[in-house]
From Swiss-Prot:
Family the UniProt entry places it in: Belongs to the fatty acid desaturase type 1 family.
Protein's name in the database: Acyl-lipid (9+3)-(E)-desaturase
Residues spanned by motif Histidine box-2: 139-143
Native source species: Dimorphotheca sinuata
InterPro entries in the cross-refs: FA_desaturase_dom (IPR005804), Fatty_acid_desaturase (IPR012171)
């Protein structure tokens, strides 16, 4: 039985429990209904005006950052290069916030009007080359099966028996750097296109294919709509490249998008990968236990930029329609009831990224155990 980590390891005090201690895996003494009752009812309310104000704010900042690039050529070197570097990082972070709001639309968390949510989400995600409905449906299955080794959709850890023979050659600092680089730069498009790191299917799975086994017959038409959104955005980008040049497009749009993709992969990875978290096979998995297989993280000022997708993720898994601007208050409301089932780690995200890449290579039962509870391990 582990404790909810209230602080990072480096900040642990004698009277507080270590965030690397294992989370509890027994059936929680509370129900989802108990948790819902602990949250003030007004926090479930979704205001269209307030939600759109965040959309407008993010898009305004993104435009101002873009507008600033039109003055970079007036700067002497090396300040031009530094200005572009600052732009890439800042714009990548802002667009991650835009991506998060699009994700919230997919959960019907923007407003009380599902059609409005899907329209806004479709526009925002398509502009970032994300197939909106395609990912919405696969992500919904992730929420329905979190923590399940058999049915979860993404970042499903492999049991020891299924790790590749060559994995041991990457279990070193150089190998980890290579794996992290590929994961952060190519992980998102590889997942969408080839289902890399996703749940295994009996045939080819792809977010762009209406015939993918990820989707049922009722969903296939909207996969076509998602693809149309990607095609329209691609044509706009092609036209921009023809008018402004390919280098301009890469600098203004391509590099920030890569940073956005890297952040969304990193955030998702750290939300569900932690030495303290269990995973379950079918004999042990229950929805509430699985929903608790996640950890809130501290990304510093980026918590706000990313609309609390980082430090409000547990309550998001429990109640995904709660709007992001109420997530922290809702988290505060459920923490006393959750007790040690609430997992939080304030380790800086770049430190946690390296630690998890080193410690969380596969999952296995504890020695001598035969149950359905699996823990992260790294000894091959």
């Amino acid at each position: 039985m582990g404790a909810g980590g209230c602080i990072s390891v480096s900040e642990t005090k004698p009277n507080q429990k270590n965030s690397l201690e294992r989370a509890p895996y027994d059936k929680p003494p509370f129900t989802i209904s108990d948790l819902k009752k602990a949250i003030p009812p007004h926090l479930f309310k979704r205001s269209l005006i307030r939600s759109l104000s965040y959309v407008a704010s993010d898009l305004t900042v993104a435009f101002l950052l873009y507008h600033a690039t039109t003055y970079f050529h007036h700067l002497p070197q090396p300040f031009t290069a530094l200005a572009w570097l600052a732009y890439w990082v800042a714009q990548g972070c802002v667009l991650t916030g835009v991506w998060v709001i699009g994700h919230e639309c997919g959960h019907h968390g923007l407003s009380e009007y599902r059609g409005v949510d899907d329209t806004v989400g479709y526009i925002l995600h398509s502009s970032l080359l994300v197939p909106y409905f395609s990912w919405k449906y696969s992500h919904r299955r992730h929420h329905s099966n979190t923590g399940s080794l058999d049915r979860d959709e993404v970042f499903v850890p492999k049991p020891r028996s299924k790790i590749s023979w060559y994995s041991k050659y990457f279990n070193n600092p150089v190998g980890r750097i290579g794996v992290l680089f590929i994961t952060l730069t190519l992980g998102w498009p590889l997942y969408l296109t080839f289902n890399v790191s996703g749940r295994p299917y009996d045939r080819f799975a792809c977010h762009y294919s209406p015939n993918s086994p990820i989707y049922n017959n009722r969903e296939r038409f909207q996969i076509y709509l998602s693809d149309i959104g990607i095609v329209i955005t691609s044509l706009v980008l092609l036209r921009a490249a023809m008018v402004k040049g390919l280098v301009w497009l890469i600098c203004v749009y391509g590099v920030p998008l890569m940073i956005t993709n890297g952040f969304l992969v990193l955030v998702t990875y750290l939300q569900h990968t932690h030495p303290s978290l269990p995973h379950y096979d079918n004999s042990e998995w229950e929805w509430l236990k699985g929903a608790l297989v996640t950890v809130d993280r501290d990304f510093g000022v980026l918590n706000t930029v990313f609309h609390h997708a980082t430090d409000g993720h547990i309550v998001h898994h429990l109640f995904p329609t709660i709007p992001h601007y109420n997530a922290m208050e809702a988290t505060k409301a459920v923490k006393p009831l959750m007790g040690e089932y609430y997992q939080y780690d304030a380790t800086p995200f770049y430190v946690a990224m390296w630690r998890e890449a080193k410690e969380c290579l596969f999952v296995d039962r504890d020695e001598g155990e035969k149950g359905g509870v699996f823990w992260y391990k790294n000894k091959m």
